[in-house]
């Protein structure tokens, strides 16, 4: 009789497992990450400008650590974000990581909530990394290499639009500015990351050799580290590529637009995760995917109301 009871219990467990699995299927998202663009210049930044590379590795940790903590604390616990999570991020940056971290290990909850949004970030971050590698490397045809990686990026279903978006309008949702208002220190820290990511382009392009590139990075890194120590809470909007690297933005306007749009999407998602106006995890996921699909992905270009005409510039 014990055998029959065990069989019944096992059947119940199997049935429950299948039911749970079927319920979860509606939320299942395949991990369809692409391999990075392969070239001889891969990892040139890591090999030749390791100091700058380690700072970017810290940036990767900061975004994921923030999103995970916003989710797990409900987005309202100021000490948990401004003190604990921010200090965790600063400690990781100070450790000078030699490799970029596994962001899914840092933010497993967020990755389950909004995998497609995270993969949108990952693809654009890979474009960042590729452009740095090309500029630091001894690649003789840098212009063509950059055009090639842009074309590779734009083949992705997760590619952010290369058109200029109206960032001011994208900052007018009902939940907009929640994050920077409630967490000004961490917000300014995030904007400091974005300063570093775009401020390096013009100096890297202008420097003729590795020694000159190394020298050119010193004042930018010094400024960035000052921002980490004393976050620029007086800033009212995120840094823009054309403001900090105007030569790069003029030469590669599509890439500059992608990076600015990427950074605006970071701000939107921070606001969604922090806002009580988007109260549940399901609601947050729905809103994140709504704005990604409607306003940020290149696949929406034909009907995206946030695209700015060439004659306009809304910043």
Identify what each model region corresponds to:
Residues 1-2, 303:
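...the same signal can extend to comparable exposed beta-sheet modules
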Residues 2-12:
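Bacterial N-terminal signal peptides that target proteins for export
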Residues 13-20:
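Core hydrophobic alpha-helical transmembrane segments of single-pass membrane proteins
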Residues 22-24:
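C-terminal motif of bacterial Sec signal peptides marking the signal peptidase cleavage site
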Residues 26-315:
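Polar/charged low-complexity regulatory segments
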């Amino acid at each position: 009789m014990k055998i029959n009871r065990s069989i019944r219990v096992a059947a119940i467990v199997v049935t429950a497992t299948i039911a749970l699995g079927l319920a979860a299927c509606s939320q299942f998202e395949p991990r369809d990450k692409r391999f990075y663009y392969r070239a001889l210049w891969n990892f040139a930044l890591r090999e030749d400008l390791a100091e700058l590379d380690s700072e970017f590795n810290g940036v990767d940790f900061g975004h994921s650590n923030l999103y995970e903590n916003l989710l797990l604390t409900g987005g309202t616990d100021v000490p948990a974000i401004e003190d604990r999570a921010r200090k965790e991020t600063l400690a990781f940056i100070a450790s000078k990581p030699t490799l970029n971290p596994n962001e899914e290990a840092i933010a497993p909850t967020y990755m389950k909530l909004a995998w497609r949004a995270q993969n949108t970030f990952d693809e654009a971050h890979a474009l960042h990394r590729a452009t740095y590698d090309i500029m630091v490397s001894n690649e003789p045809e840098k212009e063509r290499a950059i055009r090639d990686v842009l074309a590779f990026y734009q083949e992705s279903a997760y590619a952010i639009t290369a058109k200029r978006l109206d960032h001011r309008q994208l900052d007018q949702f009902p939940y907009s500015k929640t994050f920077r208002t409630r967490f000004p220190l961490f917000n300014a820290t995030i904007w400091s990351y974005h300063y570093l990511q775009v401020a390096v382009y013009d100096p890297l392009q202008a420097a003729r050799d590795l020694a000159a590139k190394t020298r050119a990075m010193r004042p930018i890194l010094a400024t960035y580290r000052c921002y980490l120590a004393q976050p620029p809470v007086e800033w009212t909007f995120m840094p823009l590529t054309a403001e900090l690297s105007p030569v790069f933005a003029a030469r590669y306007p599509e890439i500059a637009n992608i990076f600015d749009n990427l950074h605006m999407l970071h701000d939107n998602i921070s606001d969604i995760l922090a806002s009580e106006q988007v109260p549940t995890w399901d609601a947050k996921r729905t809103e994140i995917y709504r704005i990604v699909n409607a306003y940020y992905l290149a696949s929406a270009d034909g009907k995206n109301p946030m695209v700015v005409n060439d004659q306009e510039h809304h910043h």
